């Protein structure tokens, strides 16, 4: 039986993929006590990297927000794996760390990462409200425009 969070995802038309396997010497998440640390997630959808390029150059703010949303969906996939498939065990999204591959003069990192923050609140309600960092990066793996990591509390 689907839980409340799965029902909310379905209502929003969001399909959560299986948690992506790491591409280097790390794991997708670590659980310490009741805290889950999710490794940086990139905008990968259906096995393909989306929105590759620098924000402020090839990638618009709106496209970067979509990239951030895909990152958030991939974070939710990792949390689902960490919770044994039951997203209702997520008590709180504690923090998101957002990295934006942008031109040196780009200053709208917070608006970009809102793509992920807004989704967390849409999906988890008040439990999705979190602290956050939104910073610029000179480059990100594979040239993706956004990477986001997360900290969450679980039951």
What residue spans do the PLM features occupy?
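Short, polar/acidic, helix-capping and beta-turn segments at strand->helix junctions
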Residues: 1-155
């Amino acid at each position: 039986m689907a839980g409340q969070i799965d029902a909310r995802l379905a209502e929003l038309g969001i399909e959560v993929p299986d948690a992506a396997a790491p591409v280097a010497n790390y794991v997708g998440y670590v659980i310490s006590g009741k805290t889950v640390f999710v490794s940086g997630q990139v905008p990968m959808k259906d096995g393909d990297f989306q929105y590759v390029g620098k924000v402020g150059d090839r990638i618009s703010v709106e496209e970067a927000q979509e990239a951030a949303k895909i990152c958030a969906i991939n974070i939710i996939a990792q949390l689902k794996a960490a919770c044994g498939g039951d997203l209702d065990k997520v008590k709180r999204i504690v923090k998101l760390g957002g990295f934006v591959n942008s031109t040196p003069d780009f200053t709208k990192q917070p608006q970009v990462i809102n793509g992920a923050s807004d989704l967390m609140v849409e999906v988890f309600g008040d439990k999705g409200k979190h602290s956050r960092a939104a910073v610029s990066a000179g480059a990100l793996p594979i040239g993706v425009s956004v990477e986001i990591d997360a900290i969450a509390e679980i039951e």
